[in-house]
């Protein structure tokens, strides 16, 4: 096995901070996430990493919740990539269009290269009943998609899931094709799981499974949303669902991912599992 990684990066999923009482039934401790983030940053700052990515749900609700959680991120010395999850849109309707900018994102979906690897961030909130105000065409289209999934009896026909539109799918397809032409392996990241089948999965995720299999260069898809975590392999792609930081009163969860030519190493901290995933 190759001894030195191509690159290393940190992963955090679902801090879901809010100044709110715990939800004991789901074991979620919203206020504790700031201290958990600070603890995670203390560890990650001591590691040689190319960047740290947070896989959505920085907050549980309320626009003002962004201030303390983003202030905590100032303690992270590494480059940081943020993306929204469903809870990041639990804000006033007039703020919905500002969420991506509040997270410092260059666009709702985008890609970048590090260490010869192409990283792609997708936005599964695009087609959802929470990311656009009621009465807008995008909200109506999302409601129609959800109604169709409900009629089919789809297990992921939930108001707290979402999907991607045709424009974003075409962009993703073109991005993977360009990476393949350049000889780049790809890691795709999003909030919603795609595989194995689960009630938390992205609407229409089967299209992405098929696209990744056809592309042949997507080594991993990394996500949050399902706080208990999950793991699967479909074709040549690993699907890794990282555990949610907001869960449990005191136990933290985050990870360092190492990419090698022949494998992916996940070094889990706290509740997160360590894994070796052969390529």
Name what the model sees in each region.
Residues 27, 56-59, 158-162, 196:
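Second-shell loop/turn segments in exported
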Residues 23-25, 64-65, 198-202, 278-279:
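Short, solvent-exposed loop/turn segments at secondary-structure boundaries
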Residues 63-182, 207-217, 232-267, 278:
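Extended active-site neighborhood of metal-dependent phosphoesterases/phosphodiesterases
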Residues 1-67, 167:
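N-terminal active-site segment of His-dependent metallophosphoesterases
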Residues 15-18, 58-61, 86-90, 125-128, ...:
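Solvent-exposed loop/turn segments at secondary-structure junctions
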Residues 32-36, 200-216:
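Short, motif-level signal for alpha-helix interfacial/capping segments enriched in acidic residues
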Residues 49, 183-184:
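Short, high-confidence coil segments that cap the C-terminus of an alpha-helix
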Residues 11-13, 52-57, 80-86, 122, ...:
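Active-site neighborhood of phospho(di)ester-bond hydrolases with catalytic His/Asp-centered motifs
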């Amino acid at each position: 096995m190759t001894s030195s990684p191509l690159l290393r990066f940190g992963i955090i999923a679902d801090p879901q901070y809010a100044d709110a009482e715990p939800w004991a039934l789901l074991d979620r401790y919203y206020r504790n996430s700031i201290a958990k983030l600070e603890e995670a940053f203390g560890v990650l700052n001591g590691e040689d990493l190319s960047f740290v990515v947070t896989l959505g749900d920085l907050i549980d609700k309320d626009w003002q919740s962004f201030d303390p959680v983003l202030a905590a991120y100032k303690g992270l010395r590494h480059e940081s990539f943020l993306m929204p999850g469903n809870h990041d849109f639990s804000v006033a309707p007039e703020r919905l269009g500002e969420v991506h900018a509040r997270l410092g994102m260059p666009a709702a979906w985008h890609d970048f290269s590090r260490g010869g690897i192409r990283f792609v961030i997708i936005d599964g909130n695009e087609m959802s009943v929470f990311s656009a105000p009621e009465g807008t065409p995008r909200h109506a289209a999302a409601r129609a998609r959800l109604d169709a999934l409900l009629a089919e009896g789809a297990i992921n026909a939930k108001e707290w899931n979402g999907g991607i539109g045709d424009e974003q799918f075409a962009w993703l397809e073109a991005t993977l094709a360009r990476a393949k032409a350049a000889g780049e392996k790809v890691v795709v990241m999003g909030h919603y799981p795609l595989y194995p089948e689960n009630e938390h999965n992205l609407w229409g995720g089967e299209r992405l499974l098929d696209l990744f299999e056809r592309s042949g260069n997507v080594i991993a898809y990394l996500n949050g949303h399902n706080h208990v975590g999950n793991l699967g392999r479909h074709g040549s792609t690993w699907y890794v669902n990282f555990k949610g930081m907001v869960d449990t009163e005191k136990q933290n969860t985050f990870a360092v991912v190492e990419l090698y030519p022949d494998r992916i190493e996940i070094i889990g901290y706290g509740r997160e599992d360590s894994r070796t995933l052969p390529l």
